[in-house]
Amino acid sequence: MFIEDVPTNSILIIAAHPDDEVLGVGGTIAKYTGMGVDVNISILADGATARYEDRMVTELQECALKAANILKVNEVYFEGLPDERLDQIPFIDVIKPIERRIAETKPYIVFVHHRGDANTDHQIIKLLLKQQSLLQGH
């Protein structure tokens, strides 16, 4: 499929952490929004890791919103899950916000982390989304 052949006006980006959406598919976001497609982003984890103080969460969210504004993103959702610990919480708590955003935005395409990504949070999101799509017959 070519990018110009998208038959719907909604795309969803699911990212583990603030900045993953821009680093992963920033150029693709710009292409789609430039075509008038509504791009929505769900950032699952809050960004509070050992390398950042809790106050950095607000700054990371502000930076994500600035980038989204530049890219003309429709909406950014911050789901507030624990950063670098998605493997330590029930998977249902990870999949619920994903399901909610898919139901709300009704995307034709969902972008998620690459299957070869080494980050544990990224791997979990990819695995859960793949399982969920198989269960729903996509």
Identify the residue ranges that each predicted region occupies.
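Active-site adenylate/phosphate-handling loop in enzymes that bind or generate adenylated species
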Residues: 97-138
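Active-site rim/loop-helix segments in enzyme catalytic domains that contact anionic ligands
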Residues: 1-105, 131-135
